Amino acid sequence: MDIRAAEISAILKEQIKNFGQEAEVTEVGQVLSVGDGIARVYGLDNVQAGEMVEFESGVRGMALNLEQDNVGVVIFGVDRDIKEGQTVKRTGAIVDVPVGKGLLGRVVDALGNPIDGKGPIVSTERRRVDVKAPGIIPRKSVHEPMATGLKSVDALIPIGRGQRELIIGDRQTGKTAIALDTILNQKPAHEGTDEKAKLYCVYVAVGQKRSTVAQFVKVLEDNGALDYSIVIAATASDPAPMQFLAPFSGCAMGEFFRDNGMHAVIIYDDLSKQAVAYRQMSLLLRRPPGREAYPGDVFYLHSRLLERAAKMGDAAGAGSLTALPVIETQANDVSAYIPTNVISITDGQIFLETDLFYQGVRPAVNVGLSVSRVGSAAQTKAMKKVAGKIKGELAQYREMAAFAQFGSDLDAATQRLLNRGSRLTELLKQPQFSPLKMEEQVAVIYAGVNGYLDAIPVNRVRAFEDGLLSTLRGRHADLLETIRTSKDLGDDAAAKLKGVVESFAKSFS
């Protein structure tokens, strides 16, 4: 065998040249105690608040309590494999998640790992989950409508891009249904080519049953809405730290769109469960409890999350992130700690009531208690013109209906008001999964506020609406297109709409 000395020496030289002299230094600590998803670790003196640490078993955790002699770490996973005396390694990284368009159509956990069995996430960028909200100067006031497709919301409680609108109500009142319809309503925009009209959807499920989340994802998939949506799931069986983190992870994913001049909406379903998870972590970390045993900084938990929803100014790309937090109340008690906190942080609330739900008013929006602090600034001119009257009429109707229970002999004006009110209430009902376009809502509400429904029996209002819409879609598509493109109800369009509604009202009876 021929041994070439020159060749061997060249190989040796190459290997010696690449030999690194620096030793790798990692800061490690030791587990003092572990239990209830919390580990006390000794020795990580330079660890940062919110930094990821890794246990011997490969499970990761987050340093939350930095105390004098130890660090309180919350564990992202099961603590069964973590034993006292094991080593814990610093990662040097604050908790971050993958972001970008590669996440669209996927279901991920609170750390951004895929849980839908569709393979790895294709993402080039990562972002920290907990960042500072945009300052005052880069923002712009909310002025573009964020259409939900629901008449009662778009007409009475309009939501704008960059707004935070709370959806609040007892369990089983249709809170998630409003969020779901909002996502489905974005489909026509995504089928078009106008990038500015597109609204990407991020849905964060916190503490829900896995079957519920699976059903939600299936509805999105069946309706072709999953392609422009991201679902982050921290279900009831996940550890409390994951439920605490999920809304922040979702927000980071939504901010990618906001900061790149695009528009997104994020739905936190729901923040009451996040607060409960945070309370559990805080109490186990021995932080002092406050009202309802929540820690003192539970307000800051939600305010720093919701302040990240914003409408950016032109200099910052003119993107937006709209937040729709959901809060579950107990027996309609909005004066509990978490509901009052979130009401004071958000720009308005959609209040859903069990009684209305069982009366068949669905969506079960209590128009009197619901409010949008952005108001008509987030409505198109066409909607503003027709919906301006409906608020006042419904307010008067509610007032009169309360009095009418006592007296039987009502004058003609009051009777007229009650008639109109009951028909408008019927008009605002809408079945699930059938969002309406803005121009269709304008036409229907126009018919209601201008008295074309007054002579029609209440139980026929739904049929009138369906008939009017099919007439408009079939024979007067150009009129709907005019309203859609101009976003206004000009004199010509109004006259044409009046003619269509009048002739339809005559033929319908």
From Swiss-Prot:
Annotated compartments: Cell inner membrane
Molecular function via GO: ADP binding; ATP binding; proton-transporting ATP synthase activity, rotational mechanism
Site features described as Required for activity, chain residue numbers: 370
PROSITE patterns, A to Z: ATPASE_ALPHA_BETA (PS00152)
Classification via InterPro entries: ATP_synth_asu-like_sf, ATP_synth_asu_C, ATP_synth_asu_C_sf, ATP_synth_F1_a_nt-bd_dom, ATP_synth_F1_asu, ATPase_a/bsu_AS, ATPase_F1/V1/A1_a/bsu_N, ATPase_F1/V1/A1_a/bsu_N_sf
CDD domains assigned: ATP-synt_F1_alpha_C, ATP-synt_F1_alpha_N, F1-ATPase_alpha_CD
Family: Belongs to the ATPase alpha/beta chains family.
Name assigned to this protein: ATP synthase subunit alpha
Organism: Methylobacterium sp. (strain 4-46)
Biological classification of the source: Bacteria, Pseudomonadati, Pseudomonadota, Alphaproteobacteria, Hyphomicrobiales
